[in-house]
Design a protein with these regions (language model features):
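Active-site anion-handling motifs in enzyme catalytic cores
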Residues: 1-387
Length: 387
């Protein structure tokens, strides 16, 4: 198959990187092209070894299409066509070398402005290219919106990464299958690690600007992480790996992690993990005895290597993945919106940490079958390409 991937962020978000890597590992020997938002950054993390990287956007001259979109913006305030114009040349160039186009930004329907993804879906359709919404999570109330439901039905296939989204999309009448997030399929890559991983138990911690942005009580998320670190230092002998998973300039996990590191006077039990590729981060996380994470794909790196994990989440993806892995999300996901008192994350940690051996055994038993479900999506894509 000739597969084009689009709608994804660049690899400085290592979740975006992990989706591409996991997709290639799942689907195997095909021709891959990525319509990249930042070819240089994607190449920096090695994605050019897996796929041809093509700029997703091109500067548009002021042709009729530009003038029409500009008029629509000025008259109606609708900027979707104006934004979408810059993607059209790359999409039109895909016609001769694409069997399937995968929209791989799994969170794209979580953050508003879904109209641009409907625009891109239609743009591929005009080139007679079948589209697949790949590894997605969408809040059921968003799926229920008529415009979203209509858009979802225009995909040849929707591959939902958890059951909450699957049921909502199925009810909307779209062609849908349920698969694990493609990042579950990405293999870790061994790398050099801090020597403290060899000398002591290590608990991994990830915090993100995103959960701080989504908190309802200002300062609650950071205060809870700070209290958790203090608890671990007072009540265990474990070292703590402060682990970034997104390093974009405007959304950089290293900023709150470095603040935590400094707030504890760079205590020798704290490991400030540097930036790595997604497979290397997965390897580092796999060496933790327990993981507390905010970034979805940091927690997937933990889950998929059998590491007991507490998720500080804010959306359907965290709830749905935990429900599919454990049968429920309560106790496994702490919604950041609910944080009020500074000890809530610590209490949730204590509850899971006490059960860590049983959780690890459960993950090790069920993960092979869970990940194997992804094979259904591979077969579905092959059938679409042949149809």
């Amino acid at each position: 198959m000739k597969i084009t991937m689009y709608g994804n962020g660049s690899a400085g978000n290592h979740g975006c990187e992990a989706i591409i890597r996991g997709t290639v590992q799942l689907l195997g020997a095909n021709e891959y092209c990525v319509l990249s938002e930042n070819c240089g950054e994607d190449a920096q993390y090695g994605l050019n070894a897996l796929a041809e990287l093509v700029p997703a956007k091109e500067t548009r001259k002021k042709d009729f299409g530009f003038l029409r979109a500009y008029a629509k913006l000025k008259l109606t305030g609708n900027y979707t066509d104006m934004d979408g114009l810059y993607y059209l040349p790359a999409i039109q160039n895909c016609k001769k070398n694409t069997d399937i186009a995968l929209s791989i930004g799994g969170d794209n329907y979580c953050y508003g402005n879904t109209a641009i993804y409907a625009y891109l879906n239609r743009a591929f359709g005009k080139q007679s290219i079948k589209t697949v919404l790949w590894g997605c999570s969408i809040e059921p109330d968003v799926v229920a919106e008529p415009s979203t439901s209509e858009d979802l039905r225009h995909y040849a296939l929707v591959a939902a990464r958890e059951s909450i989204t699957y049921e909502a999309v199925k009810a909307a009448g779209a062609n849908v299958v349920q698969i694990p997030d493609p990042a579950f399929c990405m293999q870790p890559k061994e790398c050099a690690m801090d020597e403290r991983f060899l000398k002591s138990e290590v608990i991994g911690i990830n915090i993100s600007p995103m959960i701080i942005h989504n908190e309802r009580n200002a300062g609650a998320a950071y205060a809870n992480y700070k209290a958790l670190i203090q608890y671990i230092m007072d009540n265990t002998d474990a070292s703590i790996a402060l682990t970034p998973h997104v390093v974009w300039a405007n959304n950089d996990d290293r900023i709150p992690l470095k603040q935590l590191y400094d707030d504890f006077d760079q205590n020798p039990r704290l490991i400030l993990v540097e930036d790595h590729t997604a497979p290397e981060l997965k390897y580092i996380i796999s060496k933790c005895s327990f993981f507390v994470g905010a970034r979805t794909h940091a927690t997937i790196a933990a889950y998929s290597t059998g590491v007991p994990t507490l998720v500080v989440g804010y959306s359907v993806k965290a709830r749905g993945i935990a429900r599919d892995l454990f049968g429920l999300e309560d106790g496994y996901v702490l919604p950041v919106q609910q944080l009020k008192e500074s000890n809530e994350l610590t209490q949730a940690f204590i509850g899971l940490y006490e059960k860590r051996d049983a959780i690890r055994a459960h993950l090790n038993e069920m993960l092979p079958g869970y990940i194997a479900r992804a094979d259904a999506a591979r077969k579905a894509l092959e059938e679409l390409a042949e149809a």
